[in-house]
């Protein structure tokens, strides 16, 4: 590369840097628009954007006019003397200490992003939910909370401990990898700080969600994979890294293509595949693609949960506000997300364009490209259920491999970058120009509330319900005035909730036609309302249309697979369709989610009695006999079960309870004729 082209690349990269700063300023004046990825300067006063812009320009101007951005680096070999281990250890300890203190001191005080207050409330229960999509994270948080039993706010503290610990672990892993990859201290620090400046870093500041350890695992996977590609580790180390990521979150599956590449490339089989004719390669690719498409279509049609996990290609009955793969809303959200996670991308991309082609050859870059494309594909096709501005954390893991790739490309080709150290400073600075305000906005409660309120006008179907988080925030902070105000706003804007409440009232009054219409209106407001679908299914059972009822219940479960009430309703729909095994499974799933529920047990009793499954029937009877909330029909069933087993004393006590609740005494007289040993205690 000529000196002229080196200088040209620097000038264009500086222009990209300045453009990003200006974009942040523009975003600060448009917080109410879909600029959530770059409007973070807006929440700190009118002068803050201009101060930050001035700092960014002063930094670039100083580096440029001092000649640091135009210094060309002479070609050097990789035989430079190794850095003394003690010196790098001291530097690493200082970095770990600084970041660790920052994670602790600036931990989040508000939890509006992601599903924060909702999952915090769930973890505070006696039987917290562990989602199948994030088993590892869920179990880890449950274990930590139980270990802190007796400590005030143990649920919140468990999130904070895990988040901050994951952050410190991430810093340590990055520094260890930098030490293994590069010899020069400057290169190690640039690579490490580059990775630590990524937008995913907010997850390490006591963030309340189930993604911090998963992001750490993706960081471990990325860096271990890079070391394997460089020949510094055995290729089989990538498998436990993959297993850890998949265990923590289902999105770990996106790492699989990179695993296949590492295991196959540079092997006899891999070299044989590489040597095949072009037609043979295309044929293999076609077969693999067809197999993948076939599997995808099967799962797409077999499971509503799988189908609804993806942004639809075209509008359908579940589309909210026209949000499809090709919609302008989705495209803007993706751009915002990528700017948020990879702030330095424009600068580093410009520098990469001017690198020689040899910079992109080798297993290391092939590994990075496969991995980056795989994880970025997830951000494109996976559905942000809460809306991308709040669900950004679901996709945060995708930023780690891409940021690592860009900074590795920069450091590994430093001899082709004019003013390499200074240009690296600008790229890293861009990351912190976004990350620091984001952290501050969540650490300062007033800023967190202001930021969240700016989100409440973007997605009417999702964000109107999110107003309940403001109520929860003020309740936790014991601000009764703010809580009352938030409740009033929530009621005023919660059109879906009002329609659902109206429908439930009409259903209780046996006005099933009108109730169904209310639920349909709720679905117009929010096409993804699981509550509306499950109650619409109950209406269709009353209309004697069990097949339609079952369809609605399957949709409801696809939208909310973990709700015990919906699972109970699904079991009832299966029961009326005479699919008894699936009904039984659904009811036991409901009880697994909430062991206190009575209704699934009553339905299980009904089914076991109908199918003459005496042993199972008796088992359910024993489990509910002492419950104080049994209605009269259930008490009669329990009493009959005890009579059948000649347990007359228990039967008598059960019937006394039933009589107290209004059971017809004549029934007792009839029972005594066939069971003369039955004695009902006096009132």
Model-derived features: positions:
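Transmembrane signal-anchor helices characteristic of membrane glycosylation enzymes that use polyprenol
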Residues: 12-31, 47-66, 84-113, 285-303, ...
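Extracytoplasmic catalytic/substrate-binding loops of multi-pass membrane glycan-assembly enzymes
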Residues: 105-121, 128-144, 153, 157
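Short acidic/glycine- and proline-prone juxtamembrane loop motifs at membrane-interface regions
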Residues: 114, 203-213
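Transmembrane-helix motifs of polytopic, lipid-linked glycan transferases
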Residues: 161-182, 220
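Transmembrane-helix signature of polytopic, membrane-embedded enzymes
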Residues: 174-197
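Membrane-interface alpha helices of multi-pass inner-membrane proteins
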Residues: 219, 235-250, 256-260
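Membrane-lumen/periplasm interface segments of specific transmembrane helices
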Residues: 258-262, 279-353, 375-378
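Canonical tetratricopeptide repeat
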Residues: 501, 535, 569, 603, ...
């Amino acid at each position: 590369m000529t000196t002229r082209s080196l200088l040209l690349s620097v000038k264009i990269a500086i222009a990209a840097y300045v453009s990003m700063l200006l974009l942040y300023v523009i975003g600060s004046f448009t917080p109410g628009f879909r600029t959530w990825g770059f409007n973070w300067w807006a929440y700190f006063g009118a002068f803050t954007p201009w101060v930050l812009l001035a700092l960014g320009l002063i930094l670039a101007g100083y580096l440029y006019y001092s000649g640091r951005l135009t210094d060309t680096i002479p070609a050097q070999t990789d035989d430079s003397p190794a850095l003394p281990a003690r010196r790098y250890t001291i530097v690493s300890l200082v970095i770990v200490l600084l970041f660790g203190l920052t994670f602790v001191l600036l931990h989040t005080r508000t939890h509006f992003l992601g599903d924060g207050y909702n999952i915090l409330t769930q973890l505070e229960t006696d039987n917290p939910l562990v989602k199948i999509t994030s088993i590892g994270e869920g179990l880890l948080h449950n274990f930590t909370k139980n270990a802190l039993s007796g400590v005030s706010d143990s649920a919140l503290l468990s999130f904070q401990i895990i988040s901050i610990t994951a952050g410190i672990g991430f810093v340590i892993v990055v520094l260890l990898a930098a030490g293994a990859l590069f010899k020069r201290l400057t290169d190690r620090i640039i690579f490490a700080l580059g990775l630590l400046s990524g937008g995913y870093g907010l997850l390490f500041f006591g963030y309340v969600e189930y993604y911090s350890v998963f992001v750490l695992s993706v960081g471990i996977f990325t860096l271990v994979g890079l070391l394997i590609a460089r020949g510094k580790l055995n290729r089989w180390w990538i498998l436990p890294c993959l297993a850890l990521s998949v265990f923590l979150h289902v999105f770990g599956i996106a790492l699989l293509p990179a695993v296949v590449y590492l295991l196959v490339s540079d092997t006899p089989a891999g070299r044989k595949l590489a040597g095949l004719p072009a037609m043979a390669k295309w044929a293999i690719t076609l077969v693999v693609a067809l197999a993948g498409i076939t599997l995808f279509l099967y799962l797409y049609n077999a499971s509503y949960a799988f189908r609804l996990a993806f942004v639809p290609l075209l509008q359908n009955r579940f589309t909210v506000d026209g949000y499809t793969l090709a919609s302008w809303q989705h495209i803007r959200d993706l751009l915002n997300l990528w700017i948020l996670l990879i702030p330095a991308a424009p600068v580093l991309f410009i520098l990469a364009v001017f690198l020689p082609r040899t910079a992109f050859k080798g297993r290391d870059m092939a590994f990075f490209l496969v991995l980056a494309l795989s994880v970025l594909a997830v951000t494109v096709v996976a559905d942000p259920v809460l809306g991308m501005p709040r669900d950004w954390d679901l996709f945060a893991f995708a930023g780690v491999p891409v940021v690592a790739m860009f900074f590795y490309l920069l450091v590994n080709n430093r001899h082709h970058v004019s003013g390499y150290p200074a240009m690296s400073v600008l790229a890293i600075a861009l990351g912190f120009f976004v990350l620091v305000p984001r952290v501050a906005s969540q650490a300062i409660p007033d800023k967190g509330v202001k930021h969240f309120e700016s989100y409440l006008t973007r997605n009417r179907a999702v964000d109107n319900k999110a107003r309940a988080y403001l109520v929860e925030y003020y309740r936790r902070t014991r601000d009764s005035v703010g809580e009352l105000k938030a409740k009033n706003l929530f009621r005023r804007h919660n059109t879906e909730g009002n329609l659902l409440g109206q429908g439930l009232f009409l259903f209780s009054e046996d006005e099933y036609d009108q109730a169904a219409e209310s639920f349909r209106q709720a679905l117009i407001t929010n096409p993804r309302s699981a509550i509306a679908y499950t109650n619409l299914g109950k209406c269709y059972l009353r209309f004697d249309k069990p097949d339609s009822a079952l369809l609605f219940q399957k949709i409801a479960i696809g939208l909310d697979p973990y709700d015990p009430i919906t699972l109970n309703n699904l079991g009832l729909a299966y029961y009326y369709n005479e699919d008894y095994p699936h009904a039984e499974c659904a009811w036991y799933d409901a009880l697994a989610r909430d062991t206190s529920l009575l209704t699934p047990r009553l339905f299980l009793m009904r089914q076991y009695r109908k199918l003459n499954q005496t042993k199972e029937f008796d088992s359910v009877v024993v489990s509910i006999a002492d419950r104080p909330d049994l209605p009269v029909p259930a008490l009669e069933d329990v009493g009959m079960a005890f009579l059948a087993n000649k347990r007359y004393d228990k039967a008598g006590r059960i019937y006394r309870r039933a009589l107290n609740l209004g059971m017809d005494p004549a029934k007792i007289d009839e029972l005594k004729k066939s069971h003369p040993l039955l004695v009902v205690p006096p009132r």
